[in-house]
Amino acid sequence: MADEKNKPENPDLDQRDINNPRDREALKQAADDFLKARRAEARAEAAADEAEGEVDETANRIAVLEADNTELKDQMLRVAAEMENLRKRTQRDVQDARAYAITNFARDMLSVSDNLRRALDTIPADALEADSNLKSLSEGVEMTERAMLLALERHGVKKLEPEGQKFDPNFHQAMFEVPNPDLPNNTVVQVVQAGYAIGDRVLRPAMVGVSKGGPKVSAENGASTSEDNA
């Protein structure tokens, strides 16, 4: 097939005599035309190959750009998620800072309040009745204590009053046990020292006494059962 393609298309050329000047000129012209045609075909084939190569290269570049675009989108989503988490964390930290800014101060003031209460408790009742000045002083100290606790309460400090509640180790500290068969086990029966919390944090656990020997509370439904049947 290649030989047929490379032959001149004019069949009359086979009849030409190369020794004849006119035929030789015709053969030369035919050869020139054939070469020009082949060069044109070669250029067309080269242009087609180049165009195909450019298409392939363009397709490859598009594939690379699409991959880069996907990666950039993924990075952007990760950065956006990190920024949102940072925003929430910062907002939470700011809220905590506002809510718990007075934690140490409040704890110190509670110690002062305890000292005031202990001082009041050491004064015998008959002494107060016998000395009006001492009674006035005692009332003034008690008012100061109440004002201090009210000020702390306005800033989010809450008093824990757990008497009659189930013992909670997160908010209570058991100091002793009281045998009482009529109350469920681990019921707070006495508060030795009041506890305080700020927000959901404990400033100071309540020191309490708890019951022992009564019915236990079922963990599933809260029903009381006797200790003998437990």
Swiss-Prot record:
Q: Name one GO cellular component term.
A: cytoplasm
- Family the entry assigns: Belongs to the GrpE family.
* Primary location: cytoplasm
- Highest classification ranks of the organism: Bacteria, Pseudomonadati, Pseudomonadota, Alphaproteobacteria, Hyphomicrobiales
- Stated role: Participates actively in the response to hyperosmotic and heat shock by preventing the aggregation of stress-denatured proteins, in association with DnaK and GrpE. It is the nucleotide exchange factor for DnaK and may function as a thermosensor. Unfolded proteins bind initially to DnaJ; upon interaction with the DnaJ-bound protein, DnaK hydrolyzes its bound ATP, resulting in the formation of a stable complex. GrpE releases ADP from DnaK; ATP binding to DnaK triggers the release of the substrate protein, thus completing the reaction cycle.
The yes or no answer to whether the keyword Chaperone is present is: yes
Q: Which Pfam families match?
A: GrpE (PF01025)
Fetch the InterPro entries from UniProt: GrpE, GrpE_coiled_coil, GrpE_head
Assembly with partners or alone: Homodimer.
Q: Where is this region: Disordered?
A: 1-28, 209-230
Q: Biased-composition ranges for Polar residues? A: 221-230
PROSITE patterns reported for this sequence: GRPE
Q: Does the keyword Cytoplasm apply?
A: yes
The molecular function terms of the Gene Ontology recorded here are: adenyl-nucleotide exchange factor activity; protein homodimerization activity; protein-folding chaperone binding; unfolded protein binding
Q: Specify the superkingdom.
A: Bacteria
UniProt cross-references to CDD domains, sorted A to Z: GrpE
- Please list the GO biological process terms of this entry: protein folding
State which residue ranges cross the membrane. none
Species, as recorded: Brucella ovis (strain ATCC 25840 / 63/290 / NCTC 10512)
| Protein's name in the database | Protein GrpE
Q: Which PANTHER family match?
A: GRPE PROTEIN (PTHR21237), GRPE PROTEIN HOMOLOG, MITOCHONDRIAL (PTHR21237:SF23)
Q: Which UniProt keywords apply?
A: Chaperone, Cytoplasm, Stress response
Query: Where is the protein localized?
Result: Cytoplasm
